[in-house]
Every structure is written in C-alpha cells, then in structure tokens.
C-alpha cells in the first residue's frame, strides 16, 4: 500500500475526506453508488468484514504502525494519506476517531422484496433525521434481533459518517434499504405493521397479540411531530409504551430499543 505524506491543505487525492458534503459523497463516482466515510479501526473492520470496498485511507502518522496497522494491511493497495494530528484535523474539520478514516464505495442496495424475504422482524424508520438517533437505532436493531431496516426517503442516510460511528458499525450488520411506497405495502409481503404512537386506541406494547405475530414491521418516528395520520391509519396496530411519573414519550432511539426487545422473536 502506498503511504502518501500530506504536505498541504490542498494535497491532491484528499478531497474525499475534507472538501465534499455528505450529499456530494453519495453522488461521487457513480450515481446511485457514491462514497461514504467510515472512522475508527473497529468500524472500518466491520465494514470490511461485510464486504465493503475500501478506496482510500487517511491515518495519523503515529497510528500507521499501531492501532491502524491491521486495517492498512487488510485494505491492500489502496492509498494511505498520512500526516500529523493537527494537519489532519484542520483538513477534515474534526478529530479523527482512533486516528483513521476510510473512504469506501457504497453498495447497491437490495430491493424491498429482497429485504422482506425470509425476515420476521423489521423496522420502518419514518422521517428520523438526527444522525445520532439513526446510529443508535441501528445498533439496537443489530443487538436485539431485528432482521432488516426500511427507511423513508426523508430519513437520515444510514451511511452518514456520524451515523456509522454512533452505530459502532452496526449499519453493516443489518440489511437496509429505502421504503418505496407506504407501510401498507408491507402487507403484501406478509407483514403486519405496528406503529409506535400515542393515540386513544393504542394498545400496550406488552399485549400478547403483538409478540404472537409471525411477521411484524415496527414503525418508528421522531418524537417531535409524531407519525402522520395517514401512516397511523394504514397500520394494523397502533402501539404505546406504558410510562410512569407523567412522562409521555421517549427519545426515538430509546423507544426503539424498548420496542425491539419487547417484540423480539423468542423461539430462536
């Protein structure tokens, strides 16, 4: 692998790490593919394990023979741009987590049909734009037995750098794609839908009918505006998490973890 010393803020080849927005990264190279940034040896290792293709590395000089050595070795002949901590921080605008970044090619996403095939518990993320929440939801999904994730187009991109980091690489462990259509379309794949919302006719999340469903799609939304009426109307169940001390709602990432645990498949 070529080790390339960065000598200036305009060094050729490093624009992918410091001059492109998330939207520009998504469109780089090939429309529909693009590039994303993974950071830290552990997260990059998970991406490589999942088959993601590395394109370039940026690494603090001191980590080349240290914590990033095994990542550099696994990435083969991709260029490794290096420099001191201060220069790389100035270039990227943030401190590199564990001293290393990896630009990776985006995969072709599976279709909804492929996502729903042979799955029993999926989550639909509706309009969640906060990167931290997206990352936390994916981490809980991976840990608590969710088979796949669907996201509405107005949700945050799961391959956003911060979302990937917060998820600790869990975005590479759970299949995901964008939702085409509405949650009602999931019925044709054999799913019943459970929308997490506070309504007068909602049922408690510990209702036995929910755990008994062989195929269930759990619909999560940011706690700000809640689920749109149309989404609630299309859902087979409207579900609430019972709360104490007058608290009326949880952050969407916390609510997702509760829902995934309560509604998990237990006969594995």
PLM features per residue range, with description:
Residues 74-93, 177:
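A glycine-rich helix N-cap at a beta->alpha junction
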Residues 102, 140-144, 153-172, 229-268:
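Structured adenosyl-cofactor binding patch, chiefly the S-adenosyl-L-methionine
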Residues 6, 36, 126-127, 152-153, ...:
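Glycine- and other small-residue-rich loops at beta-strand/loop junctions that grip anionic moieties
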Residues 41, 62-63, 87, 107, ...:
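Short glycine-rich anion-binding loops that position phosphate/pyrophosphate groups of nucleotides
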Residues 4, 42, 49, 80-82, ...:
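RNA substrate-binding interface of SAM-dependent RNA methyltransferases
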Residues 1-70, 155-156:
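Boundary-proximal intrinsically disordered activation/regulatory segments immediately upstream
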Residues 66-77, 230-231:
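Short, aromatic/basic amphipathic alpha-helical patches
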